[in-house]
């Protein structure tokens, strides 16, 4: 008897249940699938995921506030990624897609109830969360609408900028996405949450940097804009306003002092070198945009050479 066909049908039924916000029904169907084919890896993986979420749903009753319930789903989505890393099984995209729809649909329902209050329609955090939810359910046009509203209040926020960049990339607005990602990783690289990113533009860059540098966590985030420049991802640049240029130079001065004074084994010390290099790159890009004296460009390049000769050779 060929068990592949019925199990495939059961998997699809389980995923449809998840997308319809019925995780309990999905569990029942997946258990049936495993009875039909005990060795089916996708069914086993999917059941682990569904059970993980059903366990988390028990705690939802602890929250009386609608907004807190929506926030709980988003926080658990990030914890779910940690669970996936720990499980270490092969990931099955149809399952992860269904789980994503389940999570963000549920969160969106709670946030929409809160958004109905006119006073909340200008709350930048709520607008960001609604945008994230629409992205999670695959409605990129509405995600763009809310994220563009959120960015009006959070122009220098790495998380909001990166979410807006990600949605633009998913909508094939490549040039806008490149500019926004570059901005996000300059303004606040530690604010970018790679677990919520979906576009191949940023996921591909993440994978390349992880493979080449063997990095993760905060250090990975600091190196990504540098390799974004090397790999030709962050290629859309802009001229800085005078006040921005002044702030950039002040930040460079502070970072140079941090790099010189902090022992390499001190906590967070590894973050300062790549952050300083990225600031140098922004200064060089500005000089090139305004056709500044080539001597100033070369002077800044030599500063990069002093702190990281390998990066210097790759960008020179």
Task: Kindly label every feature range from the protein language model.
Residues 6-32, 76-103, 126-134:
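Alpha-helical segment of the N-proximal tetratricopeptide repeat
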Residues 83, 87, 91-119, 123, ...:
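Eukaryotic alpha-helical solenoid repeat scaffolds
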Residues 8-9, 42, 125, 132, ...:
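Start-of-helix register in tetratricopeptide repeats
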Residues 23-59, 152-160, 307-314:
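Short, charge-rich amphipathic alpha-helical segments embedded
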Residues 17, 50-51, 134, 168, ...:
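Residue at a conserved register position within TPR or TPR-like alpha-solenoid repeats
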Residues 6, 23, 39-42, 123, ...:
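Residue-level recognition of tetratricopeptide repeat
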């Amino acid at each position: 008897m060929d068990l592949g066909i019925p199990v495939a049908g059961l998997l699809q039924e389980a995923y449809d249940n998840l997308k319809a916000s019925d995780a309990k029904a999905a569990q029942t169907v997946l258990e049936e699938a495993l009875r039909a084919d005990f060795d089916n890896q996708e069914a086993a993986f999917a059941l682990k995921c569904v059970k993980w979420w059903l366990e988390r749903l028990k705690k939802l009753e602890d929250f009386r506030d609608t907004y807190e319930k929506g926030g709980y789903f988003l926080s658990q989505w990030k914890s779910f990624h940690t669970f996936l890393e720990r499980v270490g099984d092969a990931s099955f995209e149809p399952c992860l897609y269904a789980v994503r729809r389940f999570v963000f649909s549920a969160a969106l329902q709670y946030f929409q109830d809160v958004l109905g209050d006119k006073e909340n329609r200008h709350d930048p955090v709520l607008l960001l969360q609604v945008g994230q939810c629409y992205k999670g359910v695959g409605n990129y046009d509405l995600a763009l609408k809310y994220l563009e509203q959120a960015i009006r209040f959070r122009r220098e926020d790495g998380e909001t900028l990166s979410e807006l960049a990600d949605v633009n990339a998913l909508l094939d607005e490549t040039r806008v996405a490149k500019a926004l990602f570059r901005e996000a990783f300059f303004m606040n690289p530690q604010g970018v949450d790679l677990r919520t990113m979906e576009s191949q533009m940023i996921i591909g860059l993440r994978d390349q940097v992880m493979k080449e540098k063997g990095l993760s966590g905060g250090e990975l985030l600091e190196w990504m804009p540098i390799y974004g420049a090397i790999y030709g991802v962050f290629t859309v640049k802009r001229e800085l306003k005078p006040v921005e240029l002044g702030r950039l130079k002040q930040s460079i001065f502070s970072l140079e002092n941090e790099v010189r004074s902090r022992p390499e084994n001190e906590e967070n010390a590894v973050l300062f070198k790549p952050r300083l290099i990225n600031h140098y790159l922004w200064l060089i890009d500005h000089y090139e945009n305004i056709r500044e004296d080539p001597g100033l460009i070369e002077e800044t390049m030599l500063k990069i050479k002093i702190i990281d000769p390998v990066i210097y050779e790759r960008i020179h």
